[in-house]
Amino acid sequence: MTELIKKGIAAREASSFLAQATTKQKNTALINLSNDLIANTATLLKENEKDIIRAKEKKTPDTMIDRLRLTEERIKEISEAVKQVVTLKDPIGEVTTMWKNEAELTIGKIRVPLGVIGIIYESRPNVTVDASILCFKTGNAVILRGGSDAIDSNKALMNVIQESLEKSGFPRTSVQLIEDTSRETAREMMRLNRFLDVLIPRGGAKLIQTVLENATVPVIETGTGNCHIYVDKAAEKQMAIDILVNAKCSRPSVCNSAETLLIHESVAEDFLPAMEMALKEYNVELRADKRAREILKDAKAATESDWEEEFLDFILAIKVVDSVEEAINHINKYGTKHSEAIISNDYATGQAFHQKVDAAAVYINASTRFTDGFAMGFGAEIGISTQKLHARGPMGLTELTSTKYIIFGDGQIRN
């Protein structure tokens, strides 16, 4: 019996316990965990430093090292995030609908945990806590597999989580970490159908594609974000510039940042120079098609791969289009079904865009950066789903549940 199968058995047993836990019990445990994270700050920083040293020895880019790094302030933020989950409504046990049928049976539909969730993710140690608390709040056991670059941080965080949950009366195996970061073990996890009810990958395109190609466990794809801003001929110029700068430059390394600008040909000559001036402050590299380069003399020539790329950097691809239909076709060809935006004061054009663009979130006159659980107003999320089953868009607590029918009768039999 492999170590992973042992974890699967333990997780299945823990999930039965978690499914019966009350909201009060879960919230009390989360409050204790929030305090325990602060109490163990010194240990967490010490273990995190091992990952940082190893990353520097490998000459890892500074942006990636920053994602790995824990600080006192970041641990406080993680602790506060745990407290925020306490304030969120527990969806477990919620009756979503109830009715009586012709046989006078009372039929209710209620929310229940998914069971055991597997999560495969990359660098950021905070995901270890985020994923743990969201699954825990919804009564799900979880098995985590983080990246090798954050293994010491993840092990330290997992130790705090497990000890804290145990002190609160919950099984240590409610939350587990796979410490073997080999590809072989990752692939074994992807095929753990006997124990995992769903697998959620969080990371770059390569990780997600590997999971989709190898998993036999049902997968919820938290896809990459090749997001577009389309500036229509009826756009308000300054609004469009402000939205583009926010969508591209506020946090370029996240999946809801804009990667491509599509601009209507009738406003390109006026808009593009003003846009270029606004982006200069951030040293954004522009990669433009032939028509855009006739206006933007310093822009690099865009290649076919640029239309497909999630840059996660200060790089913007630019294409001039003849119509909203051309913009929609480009988005549906190259987009990743994440977040797409149109800037237009024409109601009919906005409606056509949102009806025809295939994406989890479609914006009219707003930045794509709002595709986020907290920004949308429903709290923490486990990722942004770009598929249509079982969830789509930011996955909050509700999306980590399934449903069950409860039927009340008084002796009815079916004729």
Swiss-Prot record:
InterPro entries the UniProt entry points to: Ald_DH/histidinol_DH, Ald_DH_C, Ald_DH_N, Aldehyde_DH_dom, G-glutamylP_reductase_CS, Glu-5-SA_DH, GPR_dom
Record-linked Pfam families: Aldedh (PF00171)
Pathway where it operates: Amino-acid biosynthesis; L-proline biosynthesis; L-glutamate 5-semialdehyde from L-glutamate: step 2/2
Reaction equations catalysed: L-glutamate 5-semialdehyde + phosphate + NADP(+) = L-glutamyl 5-phosphate + NADPH + H(+)
E.C. code: 1.2.1.41
UniProt keyword Mitochondrion, yes or no: no
UniProt keyword terms in alphabetical order: Amino-acid biosynthesis, Cytoplasm, NADP, Oxidoreductase, Proline biosynthesis
One Gene Ontology cellular component: cytoplasm
Location of this chain's protein in the cell: Cytoplasm
SUPFAM superfamilies recorded: ALDH-like (SSF53720)
GO biological process terms held by the UniProt record: L-proline biosynthetic process
PANTHER family membership: DELTA-1-PYRROLINE-5-CARBOXYLATE SYNTHASE, GLUTAMATE SEMIALDEHYDE DEHYDROGENASE
Stated name of the protein: Gamma-glutamyl phosphate reductase
Organism, scientific name: Listeria welshimeri serovar 6b (strain ATCC 35897 / DSM 20650 / CCUG 15529 / CIP 8149 / NCTC 11857 / SLCC 5334 / V8)
